[in-house]
């Protein structure tokens, strides 16, 4: 053994060839943390000191290569002054440089995934051989930063600036064949031949058949582009990427600027440019929010995994109610491998559901994400039925009938008598109390809510609602099934609107107040889209459906009359009464035309102003900042109440629910992190400025206490 640590070992393989193996003890994956970096330095020193070493193969002792840097250490590191961050990155890069500068050839054998620092380690090697099943990429832009261990320096010099910009700015994982095509790897082999492939490359380099020094040299030099080529490549890329990323996500464009600035430098000076830009991004609020989201997502996954121990295996599912929603649920279950019965009382609804599933599967085939054979397999896994004949062996039933408590109670009671005693019943309701629906059941312990968001195939969130009598097994089984469907489940307790809709309707309430105060809804949409929402509140209402919003508003007003009941007519009332229901019937706040792709396109329709005129009670002058606060303050305060009321267990789950469920701007991190970014005391003072607008704007006593004590939701 040449070197042995807790994360890295170096040992002889054969005739002067050594293996530098990453295998971080006590962890399921390899990652770059302080320990790993320190051991890499020691391992490289040990290799350099051993005259018998003729070549080095870098590989992993786990199912994946290296997943990147340890994000938990980012939180502490990014609090350091900018100069210390730069120094830390340069120190890490000296370790990578020392490996790259070894006097012997090096080969990285890539299995599983090599992301971020994992790929940057591979780029420091002379050659890379990749398993056919492996994936590589530099996803740092998704955290509001860019690669900091040499990725913006080595990758452009290896695969060309255009390809490197595409890889870095997109932050996607890349398949082996794509990596080989652009020259990011030198060979692709079957997983079982990975070590043999690496040995073949290293032996050819040792023998002189391959010139490893010539292979290494371009990574040490400036980019091979003249001034005109640089201007064309970088300026065009910056314009395109800025348009794609938008103004709230600076990292992709900053990565291009770093590559451009370092283009005429050799490796060491170029790495200094990279480190300086990395440190600047690391200190932004965007990076703080996106890293916070990543950590929150990891927390969600840990909590969901904790349910696995007692969850029952779902081998056969069923959905009650076909149509678009039922078809979407059936598609998601089938395409992820769980066969599902789709029942309705009407043949036309069954056909609508099957058509929806078939359309979604067809779209995946067209995009190359599914083979025709797999499409046929998924379609065969959806069994339409008009009866309960095959329900005896169903493990979970998702009820997705009309949003009416009496109808849902009747259907749930009926199906309960058709399934085995331990089958789970789950209602896909968006607002109706789970405790109320449970009253119709003989086995309420087997009943939960399972709230999918529309469209099912696109929205990542599923709210799993625990009723007063829901058993831990019922909750755990539903969480496990949601995960199996490829969704991110969050467990919430029962209340009107649960988490997401309870928080969303105060936001809509703020919007209604603005319209009643004479503020142009088109202006409101523009302001909130600029704030970061994927669509403004008027457009969102049209997409959701004015009738759906009207019904949901009434449910919330009944549940929380002290702050959500408004005696005055609102914009939603006026549109509902005028039968302007949004996209579904072509007119809501906006009118809708069909574009060339057959998609609805919104256009301004002046006739809506006459519909809204009776509900405008004043003409108040408001700034864009006022518009944001009228809407965001009640949303944030209701999120605080959900946490305080125990509807959601943690701040992480609350924020992720809003990001995944309603498109809360990710770069702002979620409602509670948004409060943190303002400062709890400052947010309370801000809310107090709008106290005259009603109880939705009144901070809770506990939040005032947090403000007084200087507390935050996230440390």
From Swiss-Prot:
Residues 312-715 are annotated as: 3-hydroxyacyl-CoA dehydrogenase. Its EC number is 4.2.1.17, 5.1.2.3, 5.3.3.8, 1.1.1.35. Keywords: Fatty acid metabolism, Isomerase, Lipid degradation, Lipid metabolism, Lyase, Multifunctional enzyme, NAD, Oxidoreductase. It catalyses: a (3S)-3-hydroxyacyl-CoA + NAD(+) = a 3-oxoacyl-CoA + NADH + H(+); a (3S)-3-hydroxyacyl-CoA = a (2E)-enoyl-CoA + H2O; a 4-saturated-(3S)-3-hydroxyacyl-CoA = a (3E)-enoyl-CoA + H2O; (3S)-3-hydroxybutanoyl-CoA = (3R)-3-hydroxybutanoyl-CoA. PROSITE patterns: 3HCDH, ENOYL_COA_HYDRATASE. Pathway: Lipid metabolism; fatty acid beta-oxidation. The keyword Lyase applies. Gene3D superfamilies: 1.10.1040.50, 2-enoyl-CoA Hydratase, Chain A, domain 1, NAD(P)-binding Rossmann-like Domain. In the N-terminal section; belongs to the enoyl-CoA hydratase/isomerase family. In the C-terminal section; belongs to the 3-hydroxyacyl-CoA dehydrogenase family. This is Fatty acid oxidation complex subunit alpha. The lineage of its organism: Bacteria, Pseudomonadati, Pseudomonadota, Gammaproteobacteria, Pseudomonadales. The gene is fadB.
